[in-house]
Amino acid sequence: INNFEFNTGKAIRLQDASGRYSEFLKSTLDKHIKVKKLKIVLDCGNGATYEIAPNIFWELGHKVISINNKPNGININQSCGAVDVSQLSKKVVDEKADIGFAFDGDGDRLIVVDEKGMEIDGDKIIALFATHLTKLNKTNSKFPVITTVMSNLGFEKYLLNKLKIKLKRSSVGDINVIKEMGKFNSILGGEQSGHIILSNFSKTGDGILAALKVIEIISKNNKTTSKSFRLYESFPQNKVNISYKKVLTKNLKFIENLNKEKLKDKNMRILIRKSGTEPLIRLLVEGRDINKVQEYSKYYEKKIRIKLEK
């Protein structure tokens, strides 16, 4: 490099970052909704939300019980938080809480647990937001909801048939969802795993923000958590991991071809993809009829194994 005249960046430590963030979150709340004061259990996943999340919900008048809020640099996401809600489910039931929120280590994912201890995944959280926005006339078929190829077909049917909203699927990963949201000017997207993107407030996933907005909707509906999320039935799914030993030098064109096969039953869906981290072909079959799901699973598993043996 001959010319050394170029700008360099610098790092600045932001004073009271958590305080500023708290004020931002509070600024997103709808002043026209009287929020119910709830008994909430928070599973912070021994991660980034361990301190700020309990403080925010407490400041808003909720009774807060926190678990997995003692990070030591090693225990992050270890059988807790959005990765594993078993502890949260038990605590919600034991404490007779109204709702439970599970965050992952970096706080960008949210999984909800209702008052009965039942897990509510990202699909159903997005469905709740879509239903709410439809009532407010803030979304329509021109602005689709963006999720990934992993989202349940029952969720897609609910959006289209009940709300008249189209669903568009991206590749797995919240970054891919965000890109598609920008392309289609969408205000709502996310992943089944709990990334929820409310682009009117933030251009990336934010678990605490999503949790606050969930409480708003539950308050407005004046329903329990379980009744608020009683929107649709997820279709049964069957997942099969098919291992292979040979190095796959081909681009696995057969996977693309199998995914393009049109199923006669519109209430069925298949997804076949190569794992990016392990020598596995992942097969997902879902549909309204569990017997057909099992039938299609066996059929496609056999086809894949035959292809891999060639």
Predicted regions: what is each one?
Residues 23-26, 51-58, 86-93, 127-134, ...:
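Predominant activation on well-ordered alpha-helical scaffold segments within soluble catalytic domains
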Residues 46, 105-109, 117, 194, ...:
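Short, glycine/acidic-enriched loop or turn micro-motifs at the edges of active sites
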Residues 51-55, 78-80, 110-116, 155-161, ...:
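Short acidic, glycine/serine/threonine-rich loops at helix termini
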Residues 1-95:
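Gly/Ser/Thr-enriched, mixed-charge loops and adjacent short helices
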Residues 99, 136, 140-310:
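Phosphate-binding and adjacent anionic-ligand microenvironments
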Residues 61-68, 119-124, 164-172:
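Short hydrophobic/aromatic-enriched beta-strand-loop microsegments
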Residues 42-45, 103-105, 147, 190:
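Active-site flanking residues adjacent to catalytic metal/cofactor-binding acidic residues
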